[in-house]
């Protein structure tokens, strides 16, 4: 008898909403066969912080999973928000090319004033995105998202507040517990699985899976991109695979006929197109759900589903 394919759960952007995460987890437990759930591979697609009110509690929840569900495998991808949070806390690895983290400022220096980059304690050796994350943006309203900014261009104010400090305060560096710093340090930029099953119109297919927060760039060599992500190359000012938009939306052409699933969050949309899975229905908005996709079935589970008893 053929072995049953392993269940893979990919969870979209959480953005500080602990109640949504709790409800989603209960719904996943209700919707999935108990033995499949207990042995599942669970990939969190990044963006745990910012926008919502309870980043601290979200990270506490994620840290608790390996002990509560020891037979599951948990993967925590870095989103662009989590990367910037880590950059502010001084948790990013040094650039392997010998450059300094402050060298990442130059490319975007024209935006320093309007984005109000952080200039407090420790800024001199901080990655660009850490400075942007803790900065104080001049504009008060984000016209693209149709909502007010929460402190910075990243809406990081709510993350500071969840740790009991005001936005932009260097006190956050001491307020974040060591267990949270370890979690942020250990996040991966990409996760690869050689054999994941997915249901298609032609039946069940065995595929490679690549999970990365925003996606892979369409026109560039895939292996070179994966090398950069595996190595966590912090010499780059803006990492497209974590923060790009149109340029990382599609599957790279060289993967078109290679049975490779590319799964991401980030884009504020739920988009299922063949082997390209984008799971971010919530986008950090208070009134939108946090969603997950379950493989092989491609079933979508949301925190708003009335499944748990």
Swiss-Prot record:
Alphabetic keyword roster: Cytoplasm, Hydrolase, Metal-binding, Protein phosphatase
Tissue specificity annotation: Expressed in roots, stems, leaves, flowers and siliques (at protein level).
Record-listed a divalent metal cation 1 binding positions: 13, 15, 47
First and last residue of the signal peptide: none
InterPro entries linked to this entry: Calcineurin-like_PHP_ApaH, Metallo-depent_PP-like, RLPH
Subcellular location(s) per record: Cytoplasm, Cytosol
Listed GO biological process terms: peptidyl-tyrosine dephosphorylation
Main localization, broad class: cytoplasm
Keyword flag DNA damage: no
Active site positions, chain numbering: 81 (proton donor)
Cofactor(s), names only, from the UniProt record: a divalent metal cation
Example of a GO MF term: metal ion binding
Top-level lineage group: Eukaryota
Regulation: Inhibited by the tyrosine phosphatase inhibitor orthovanadate, but resistant to the serine/threonine phosphatase inhibitors okadaic acid and microcystin. Inhibited by phosphate analogs NaF and Na(3)VO(4), and the adenylates ATP and ADP. Inactivated by zinc ions.
pH dependence of function: Optimum pH is 7-7.8.
EC numbers: 3.1.3.48
Catalytic activity: O-phospho-L-tyrosyl-[protein] + H2O = L-tyrosyl-[protein] + phosphate
Cellular component GO terms, alphabetical: cytosol
Biological function: Protein phosphatase that dephosphorylates specifically tyrosine-phosphorylated peptides; especially active on dual-phosphorylated substrates containing a phosphothreonine-X-phosphotyrosine motif.
Protein name per its UniProtKB record: Tyrosine-protein phosphatase RLPH2
Originating species: Arabidopsis thaliana (Mouse-ear cress)
